[in-house]
Design a protein with these regions (language model features):
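Bacterial lipoprotein signal-peptidase II cleavage site
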Residues: 12-19
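Extended amphipathic alpha-helical interaction segments
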Residues: 138-223
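N-terminal Sec/ER secretory leader and immediately downstream segment
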Residues: 20-132
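Long, amphipathic, charge-rich alpha-helical segments that form helical bundles/coiled-coils
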Residues: 68-76, 80-92, 112-133, 137-140, ...
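Secondary-structure edge/capping motif, primarily at the C-terminal ends of alpha-helices
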Residues: 93-100, 119, 157-161, 182-190, ...
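C-terminal motif of bacterial Sec signal peptides marking the signal peptidase cleavage site
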Residues: 7-10
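A cross-kingdom marker for long, charged
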Residues: 12, 213-280
Length: 280
């Protein structure tokens, strides 16, 4: 289907311990492997729906101002801008669905359909599922099920050499938008909402997976561009990881993060997201 799979996130819901905690986290994230030019690429990238669940359960109210403007969708004309922003709109769709914003969700569906068509990543299954979402727009539970199961089945595209770069760009857009929503709602302060902070920090577990996917594609300027932009976020995660004792696996529910380091990664996520949304 069109591409941007709702891959289950590396945001755990309860504290665990040691090696088993990490294994359980990876298992729950449904870590997959796909062959690409002889290399095994492991990925457990964040699901927009999963991050939206964290936001929904954190007690924070719906904040439409953090979402990308739907009216800008028609302005994206290059493969890079269309793919990245298709992923961004996919995350915004999930967020809108969980907060019962049906009319907003419909607008994001329209953007997704338009960009999918422009990228030639739609197929019969994807069109059917998008139509099913429209038909069930007022049924939150049904929508959640549809999105979680079949929003964009990226597996086939990630294994298809000709469209793999496009699929990876969409996944990167989804990843950055999910983190952007969470960091914006936290206000750049790690003490605002412990569950959001933990979710954001735990994405350090999967950053290398995304970087590995990007690195698996050579000779593609669009992929190289995305890689160069997100590497600053990787450095932020390295700094946070070092301060936390060298691990993103926690034995307590709350995570104590240096305020300056947390603010820095929030600012860098925002900067990357802003640039991605302005690729006209």
């Amino acid at each position: 289907m069109a591409v941007a799979a709702l891959l289950v996130a590396g945001c755990s819901s309860a504290p665990q311990t040691g090696t088993q905690a990490k294994q359980d986290l990876r298992d729950s994230a449904k870590v997959k492997a796909s062959a690409y030019e002889g290399a095994m690429i492991y990925y457990s990238l964040p699901s927009p729906l999963e991050v939206a669940y964290i936001v929904e359960n954190s007690g924070i109210s719906y904040e439409p101002n953090v979402l990308h403007k739907t009216e800008l969708g028609v302005r994206y004309s290059t493969t890079k801008s269309q793919a990245i922003n298709l992923g961004i709109y996919g995350s915004d769709l999930s967020y809108s669905i969980l907060f019962n914003q049906q009319q907003v969700a419909l607008k994001y569906l329209d953007c997704i359909k338009e960009l999918s068509s422009g990228l030639d990543v739609s197929d019969t299954t994807s069109v059917k599922k998008l139509r099913e979402m429209e038909d069930n727009i007022h049924d939150k539970e049904k929508l959640k099920k549809i999105v979680a199961q079949t929003f964009f089945h990226s597996d086939a595209l990630l294994k298809e050499n000709s469209r793999r770069p496009t699929a990876i760009m969409i996944v990167a857009g989804m990843w950055i938008e999910s983190l952007y929503i969470a960091t914006e709602l936290s206000g750049g302060d790690p003490t605002t909402n412990p569950s959001l902070t933990r979710c954001i920090v735990e994405q350090g577990l999967v950053f290398d997976d995304l970087l590995g996917m990007l690195s698996s594609v050579s000779g593609n300027d669009d992929i190289a561009y995305i890689k160069s932009k997100i590497e600053v976020i990787g450095k932020d995660y390295d700094n946070i990881k070092s301060a936390l004792g060298g691990s993103f696996v926690f034995t307590s529910e709350n995570v104590t993060v240096d305020a300056a380091a947390y603010k820095r990664i929030c600012d860098d996520i925002k900067a990357v997201r802003t640039e991605f949304t302005q690729l006209f």
